[in-house]
Every structure is written in structure tokens, then in C-alpha cells.
A protein has these predicted regions:
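Glycine/proline-rich low-complexity segments that form flexible loops, beta-turns, and polyproline
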Residues: 2-133
Length: 133
């Protein structure tokens, strides 16, 4: 019986430890391009300070949300936003499956050469990005 109590205590401690976010925060918001919600894309937060790891999430219907276990650490970040736009062409792979050919739909200034920045604070952050052409 005593072994069972220790086992339960140990497993409970392990479970609670696994729930910590490790200092990571949550972030959510909206992304628009030329005044319209970005239909589908990705957003990435790249730390510019001394600590943190690059993280990101999906944009759907102009909205994104990254929960604390997967979000950025507090501090300054460079923000990269991407959107793949269909070109109107199709591609057929060796299995006969047909796919849309896509290209990057946003100017480099919003991803590769991004000058977008954000300061992340502890807790849930709300950050909206209104991108221009």
C-alpha cells in the first residue's frame, strides 16, 4: 500500500512538471494584407535577444494563436509572415495527384527581409499586424 502512495505522488509530480511552459508565453492576434484578412499563412517569432527559440503558428482567416507551451519567450523578436499564393498552374506528381503550384504572396519585407518587430511580455500577448503592399 505504501508503494502505491509513493507511485501516485511521483506520477502526479511528473504530470504537473510536464504542464509548465518553461517561461514561454502565449500570443494571438490578427493579420491583414492590403486591408484584407490573410486567408492562410504562417507567422514566426525570431528572438533578437540573448535567449529564446524561434517559434510560430498558422494563420487562418486572418487569425492566429500560439499557446504558451509553444509560444515565444519574453523579449524582443523579429516577426516573419508568409502566405503562399496559388499561381493558377497545376502540378501532377508521379502518383497522378494534382496540386496547385504556389509562390510567396507577400513582399520580402514581411518575411525574408522582415523589419516587423514585437516585444513579447509574460502572459498572453495580443499582437495585430496590418501589412501593406
Amino acid at each position: 500500500m505504501r508503494c502505491t502512495r509513493w507511485t501516485v505522488l511521483f506520477l502526479g509530480t511528473v504530470a504537473l512538471t510536464g504542464c509548465e511552459s518553461g517561461g514561454r508565453t502565449g500570443v494571438k492576434g490578427t493579420v491583414t494584407y492590403a486591408g484584407q484578412p490573410l486567408a492562410v499563412g504562417t507567422i514566426t517569432f525570431v528572438p533578437t535577444g540573448e535567449k529564446g527559440i524561434k517559434c510560430g503558428g498558422r494563420i487562418e482567416n486572418g487569425q492566429y494563436q500560439i499557446e504558451p507551451p509553444f509560444g515565444p519567450m519574453p523579449g524582443p523578436h523579429r516577426v516573419e509572415i508568409r502566405w503562399t499564393k496559388p499561381t493558377g498552374k497545376k502540378y501532377k506528381n508521379e502518383f497522378g495527384e494534382v496540386f496547385d503550384v504556389t509562390r510567396e504572396g507577400l513582399p520580402d519585407k514581411h518575411h525574408k527581409q522582415s523589419t516587423l518587430t514585437a516585444t513579447i511580455h509574460a502572459g498572453m500577448n495580443v499582437l495585430d499586424f496590418n501589412l501593406e503592399k
